Amino acid sequence: MKRHLKGSVRLLAALILLLTARQAPAQTLSGDALVNALRHGGYVLVARHASSPREAPAKQSANADNVNLERQLDDNGRATAVAMGKALRELKIPIGEVFTSPTYRALETVRLAQLPNPRTQAELGDDGQSMQGVAESQLAWLRKKVTQFPMGSNTILVTHQPNIAGAFPQWVSSLSDGETLVLGPDGKGGATLVARIKIEQWPNLKF
């Protein structure tokens, strides 16, 4: 009986420590500390799609699978998306869920980065090619999603600048093409900004 009680006490203590750790506010991180944190998981990465011309391509210059002639990545966007994905794999950063805008340029970013098992999410979309407005329901979905921190992996959301700036004006007014916000728990049930990573910085991160 005593042995069983001691075992239960140890289990309860371990659960309390785990919950406390997950509720503790995340710290601003960079360099090795950032990579180490991402390797342990528990973060949500919100990324703008890689570099894309503002004009949709003509039929002659469109990618073969871009049947709707949507905006697509330029050469720099394609190269940096590939490099980002390669860095994530080489750094052994675990990726769990991946959600992406259904736009072609976002899907192309995810495909070239080879992010695992992506799912399109309408709320991450751009409200049409004009980018003139993002519905409040989209911003609410994004704000809620970034508070759902995974255990042992990281969630990636690929979307657009108006969505990110609209949902998180306290952290950012604009992002460069492909830039990522790394969000962690704020200790109060919400999210806080841990780091900003420009897409060209991923290959320079080391562990």
Question: What are these model-derived regions, one by one?
Answer:
Residues Q148-S153, D186-G189:
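A short, structured loop/turn motif at beta-sheet edges
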Residues G42-V44, M151-T159:
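Generic beta-sheet signal
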Residues G128, A165-G166:
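Short, solvent-exposed loop/turn segments at secondary-structure junctions
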Residues A21-Q23:
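N-terminal signal peptide c-region/cleavage motif recognized by signal peptidases
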Residues K2-L12:
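Bacterial N-terminal signal peptides that target proteins for export
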Residues T28-T120, D127-S130, E136-S137, W171-D186, ...:
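Active-site-proximal alpha-helix that buttresses catalytic centers in soluble enzyme cores
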Residues A47-S52, L157-I164:
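Histidine-centered catalytic micro-motifs
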Residues L139-Q148:
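A short, acidic, amphipathic alpha-helical segment used as a generic capping/interface helix at domain edges
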